[in-house]
Amino acid sequence: MRQNLNRALAFAGLAIEASGQLVSASAVQTLSEASKRARELREDLASRGVHPDVLSFCREELLADNYFHAVLEAVKSVAEKIRTRTGLTDDGGVLVDRAFGGDRPMLAINALSTESEKSEQKGFCNLLKGTFGMFRNTTAHAPRIYWKMSKKDAEDLLSMVSLMHRRIDAATTPSRL
């Protein structure tokens, strides 16, 4: 229902977010312009191979050209996937450390049998925590008018979040003896 409302509201330069909040967006003038915007964005993201879970978390925000909130929703989708895979209820760095950190992580992105693989696991933890710190925390606390997010930057971040989703999907649950 929200998607149908947002299609109509796009002509007034408005959109309803998943939270139910009404926000401003760049207005479209014609139905073909609204369709073109959505099609171009889908094509851009499809050409990058963006993970479908990323798109499902921020579809409405992208259609409304609301890149600020699209980034927030996409990054939140990573934490949600980690919680789903592990059963943990934490958030942010604590969630990442509990799921991917230590000598016997709950989720491993590789066999953890060499120093290089252990280093890669630590690097993935740092990537996740850095992304949460830079994009989720910033967008959650900074007003949108002070924190600009261009379409190009949003697409780049969505590609990185897509990589995170693929790595989390492929992660194994090593023995925790």
Where are these regions (language model features)?
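Amphipathic alpha-helical interface elements
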Residues: 3-131, 145-148, 152, 170-177
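Structured adenosyl-cofactor binding patch, chiefly the S-adenosyl-L-methionine
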Residues: 154-171
